[in-house]
């Protein structure tokens, strides 16, 4: 019953978020979500239909939103828990990571740090992962070296390229999060 009350204050979900490359710059895009048109950063290698681990490209794909990780902050120094219909988990500094070692059984999964194989920390100092939406690229049926940690996250000022993720300004993430649900699909177009 309380879940319904919480959801009653959230707006209608957006089922499709389209991401198109910006003309003249393969590393930037325009994200279209319902009435919103938002600039975004894409991978340093642009987009690709042949995604490989470490190639720096954003996959051309239809990806479901799975869950949100957020940094939070007792002192208010980080973004608060986003309002969203997606499950949300708070990042624990020094504990939460994401495996990017293609040969490890935990490849492209949340892991606890320290981790014996290669893994990136979710508690970054640069604030890019203050809010992270996990996308289902190579997630449900993982294939070695097909790419890991393809997230929808916060962009650096000026929208420099990512390592393959989709990134928006913090204010735009706050604006979009309430519209996200498990049925939301991020569609990266050619």
What spans do the regions from the language model cover?
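Cell wall/extracellular polymer interaction/catalysis modules
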Residues: 1-162, 173-185, 189-190
